[in-house]
Design a protein with these regions (language model features):
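Signature of N-terminal electron-transfer/Fe-S-associated modules in redox systems
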Residues: 2-173
Length: 173
């Protein structure tokens, strides 16, 4: 069940959502009381963004709203507030480098500069081939003991050196 409707009673916009994403959304909806279904929006948007290529289209946000049974504006508010969501086309692999205090003191700024030089892009840009997107700076990613660190596609990489970064980037083709 989804809200007060079964999965078979979907709207045309639900065609944007894969069966895998619908299952993931349903799993999150089941964790909350029916009057708190908005609590599943972040998980739903994250699943959709990952599933459809790294950013949220208006059609995808509409489909999430329809599927969960929320006003579209509530989904747009979440998608545009949190830095984990992209609403424009970006590279396939999302890179976030922590440059907060622990990472900064351990070379995070140098790691970021190395990535910018290696990829030929600045923060907020994608490579011309669409392979990488260097996200705007994230807040602390809570891996201070193993600084400097970065995330690529939500996977943590810690104790970075320029050589380790090159190996990581080479694996993400």
């Amino acid at each position: 069940l989804r809200g007060n409707r079964s999965v078979s009673e979907t709207t045309a916009k639900d065609g944007v959502l894969s069966e895998h994403v619908k299952h993931e959304i349903d799993t999150w909806l089941a964790k909350f009381p029916p009057d708190r279904k908005r609590s599943a929006v972040i998980a739903a948007l994250r699943a959709v963004q990952h599933d459809i290529g790294g950013y949220l289209t208006r059609e995808a946000m509409d489909a999430v709203a329809d599927y969960i049974g929320l006003p579209k504006v509530q989904v747009y508010e979440v998608a545009t507030f949190y830095s984990m969501f992209e609403t424009k086309p970006v590279g396939r692999h999302h890179i976030s480098v922590c440059t907060n205090i622990s990472c900064m003191l351990c070379g995070g700024e140098e790691i970021l500069a190395h990535i910018e030089k290696r990829l030929g892009i600045k923060v907020g840009e994608s490579t011309p081939d669409g392979r990488f997107y260097l996200k705007r700076e994230e807040e602390c990613l809570a891996a201070c003991n193993n600084a400097p660190m970065m995330m690529v596609d939500h996977v943590y990489y810690e104790n970075l050196t320029p050589e380790k970064v090159d190996e990581i980037l080479d694996r993400h083709k």
